[in-house]
A protein has these predicted regions:
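A conserved hydrophobic secondary-structure block that centers on an alpha-helix together
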Residues: 37, 46-60, 147-182
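Catalytic Zn2+-binding segment of zinc metalloproteases
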Residues: 176-177, 374-387
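The catalytic-center signature of Zn2+-dependent metalloproteases
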Residues: 382-409
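Active-site-proximal, well-structured secondary-structure segments within enzyme catalytic domains
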Residues: 30, 34-36, 63-69, 73-118, ...
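Active-site recognition of the HExxH zinc-binding catalytic motif
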Residues: 168, 363-380, 401
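Extended, charged alpha-helical coiled-coil/arm scaffolds that mediate oligomerization and mechanical coupling
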Residues: 25-26, 30-68, 75
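Single conserved hydrophobic/aromatic residue that forms the stacking wall/gate
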Residues: 2-7, 11
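Short pre-active-site segment immediately N-terminal to the catalytic Zn-binding motif
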Residues: 350-370
Length: 470
């Protein structure tokens, strides 16, 4: 242990010497950038501390690592452990494809003849959007939003204050007032006050829009004689009714033109047009995968044939897999110690259909698929000497993915890849027009949902956590 500490301190001192040396100006710009990132990373993560402060910092890191793992495992346990099972007479309003996928999910869990609504967003969202069963909608909503908050062995309420306390103590060892101040120092906002100012401005506008959206929903519920006041578990259901009333747009009708396999082909087409990438699926088993659902593709330059990297796609939900959608790399491009090419993946949680059935996804999910593929294209397009320089700065990292979303609505993609699952007919122009007209529909809710999380995150990380009651 002493030898390891001595080595760490020698590395630290060497990095500081390099950065503070006059010779830094003789390096190439990318080398200067690398030197700064390494030096700043060491300094911001406690490497310059000495004595007891250094020991305490290391102990905090160890405890936080354990707490973060426990927290994530608790959420995952609740996603796996809480499943709502339906009988056939409780399927009212649900699309056939969704019901078939729910039946397959139940069968996988040994519940033949029933229908499983799993505790993941990919299952919860469509159920809350289409199910006519209000009591079941409430049950599914409460189950999802209570992950890690059920008062059992997987409850996270005791972990949250401890995590916040440790984060706060750790940055105070570095001289910062709170965790948010430390986190924002090297971001565009620079300090918490600016973030709060921005979020509060967004909050005022988004909540005003939400009030209008809820009023539209309430009007439809009243006209139907529902005799209810709109609650959170009603929001998606009545939002879909408002969408149909205002824009004559049926989400399930749109979904019939959004086959997952076709969308993957569309993404590959866009990558070819923009970056000259060609994707060839590897099916001979020569590349190991972590699950049978994962497909592997070699990426080459379609003009030169040069190998660019390997792309993995892990599209379906399964027990033990965290929810959501994301992109990641397992190896980044670099050349300083010989050429190493990118190994990266896209991961989603679509509901796997019955054997042989095509997987249909919503327009929102299709946008997310394209969004995350934008991150993968960023990885694959990298051309840097040092792996530390991959990825760009955090504030900017969503730009390429947000741009990629726009390609879903281009004529080239729509005309060639959005075809009806049964007839093969291209999506009608009038339906495309409706999709485009409704592009900003429900933005009040979506913006408020995200902003609320951001405000809570900021408040948690700027307040004194010692007396926090979660």
């Amino acid at each position: 242990l002493d030898i390891r500490r001595q080595r760490q301190m020698c590395i630290r001192d060497s990095i500081r010497t390099v950065w503070e040396s006059d010779e830094i100006e003789d390096l190439r710009p990318d080398q200067q950038r690398l030197a700064w990132l390494v030096y700043d990373g060491f300094a911001r993560n406690g490497a310059m501390l000495e004595g007891e402060a250094r020991e305490r910092y290391a102990a905090i890191n160890q405890e936080l690592a354990e707490l973060h793992t426990r927290y994530g495992n608790n959420v995952l346990a609740d996603e796996e452990g809480y499943v709502t099972y339906l009988s056939e007479d409780q399927l009212s309003g649900l699309p056939e494809a969704f019901a078939a996928a729910a039946a397959a999910a139940a069968a996988d869990r040994g519940r033949e003849g029933e229908y499983a609504i799993t505790n993941t967003r990919s299952s919860m969202d469509p159920f809350l959007t289409f199910s006519d069963e209000r009591e079941l909608r409430e049950q599914v909503w409460r189950t999802y939003y209570s992950r890690g908050d059920n008062g059992d062995e997987h409850d996270n309420n005791a972990l949250i204050p401890r995590i916040l306390e440790l984060r706060n103590e750790r940055v105070q060892l570095l001289g910062y007032d709170n965790y948010a101040a430390w986190r924002l120092e090297n971001r565009m906002a620079k300090e918490p006050g600016r973030v709060f100012e921005f979020l509060e401005a967004v909050w005022a506008a988004s909540t005003a829009r939400v009030a209008e959206e809820v009023a539209d929903m309430q009007a439809i519920a009243d006209a139907e004689g529902a005799g209810i006041t709109i609650e959170p578990w009603d929001y998606r259901y009545y939002a879909e009714k408002v969408r149909q009333a205002k824009y004559d747009l049926d989400s399930d009708e749109v979904k019939q033109y959004l086959q997952l396999d076709n969308l993957i082909a569309a993404m590959h087409f866009v990558a070819g047009e923009l970056f000259q990438f060609h994707f060839s699926q590897i099916t001979d088993g020569s590349v190991p995968v972590w699950h049978e659902d994962v497909t592997v593709w070699e990426v080459t330059n379609r003009n030169t044939g040069e190998h660019v990297g390997v792309w993995y796609l892990d599209p379906f939900a399964r027990p033990g897999k965290r929810s959501g959608a994301w992109a990641t790399t397992y190896r980044s491009h670099e050349t300083y110690d010989g050429l190493k090419t990118t190994l990266g993946s896209n991961n989603s949680n679509f509901i796997k259909g019955a054997p042989g059935e095509p997987v249909l996804i919503s327009w929102d999910d299709a946008e997310t698929l394209f969004h995350e593929f934008g991150h993968a294209l960023h990885y694959l397009s990298s051309n840097v000497a040092y792996p530390r320089l991959n990825g760009g700065v955090r504030d900017y990292t969503e730009l390429q993915s947000q741009l990629m979303e726009r390609w879903l609505q281009t004529d080239e993609v729509i005309d060639n890849y959005l075809v009806h699952v049964d007839t093969g007919e291209p999506i009608p122009d009038e339906l495309v027009a409706k999709i485009r007209n409704a592009a900003t529909f429900n933005q009040g809710f979506e913006t408020t949902e995200y902003t609320a999380s951001a405000i809570m995150d900021m408040k948690y990380h700027t307040m004194d956590p010692s007396d926090l009651d979660v």
